[in-house]
Amino acid sequence: MLKALLIVVVVIVLGVLGLAAVQPDTFTVQRQVSVSAAPDKPYALVNDFHRWGEWSPWEALDPAMKRSHAGPASGQGAIYPWEGNTAVGAGRMEITSAQPATRVEIRLDFLRPFEGHNTTVFTLTPQGAATTVTWTMTGPMPFVSKLMSVFVSMDKLIGKDFEAGLVKLKAAAEKPGA
C-alpha cells in the first residue's frame, strides 16, 4: 500500500514537472479599454509616474508604501522605485521610450517578493473621439514561473489588476480638466 502511494506521488510530481517543462519561455498579459478622450489625456497619466497614484491598481494596496522619483519628471528616463508591504513588494520602473500620445514603454524590475524583469507597454490608438488604451506586459518564464503556471497563469494572476487599473485610468482621463 505504501509503495503504491509512493508511486502515485512520484507520477504526479513527474507529471507536474513535465507540464512545467513544456510551458512557453515567455508570458504576455494584455488588456485594453476605450477612453472617451483624446490620446493626450491617458498618455499624460501613464507617462508621468507622479500621476500613477490616480489610477494604478497597486497604489492603494499599501498606503504606507515608500515611493521616490528620479530622472526627468516624465517621459524617457523617468524612474520610480517603490518599497512596500508583501502585497506590493519592492521594485523599480523606468520609462525606456515615450512617443507622445501614442506609446509608453517601461522596464519593470521586481525585487521582492520575487525577482523578475519585464517590459510593460501602453499603446494609445485614436478611435474617432475616443482612445483605445492597450496595456501589455511581457517577460521571461524561468522554470519556477513555469512550475507556478501549471496551477495559475500570469494572466490570471495580474489580468484582473490590469482591468482594475484601466477602469481607474479611464475615469481619471475622462474627468473634466484631466
Feature names for model-found ranges:
Residues 67, 170-178:
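Short, highly charged C-terminal tails/helix-capping segments
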Residues 4-67, 72-73:
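Hydrophobic ligand-binding cavity/cleft-lining segments
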Residues 23-25, 72, 85-87, 112-116, ...:
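A generic structural micro-feature
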Residues 32-36, 81-83, 94, 105-107, ...:
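Generic structural detector for well-ordered beta-strands
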Residues 96-97, 107-163, 169-171:
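Beta-strand/loop substructures that line and gate deep hydrophobic ligand-binding cavities in soluble
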Residues 39, 43-52, 77, 92, ...:
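Extracytoplasmic/secreted envelope proteins and their assembly/folding machinery
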Residues 28-30, 88-93, 115-121:
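Short, surface-exposed coil-to-beta transition loops
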Residues 49-99, 147-148:
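Extracytoplasmic/periplasmic/luminal assembly and interaction segments
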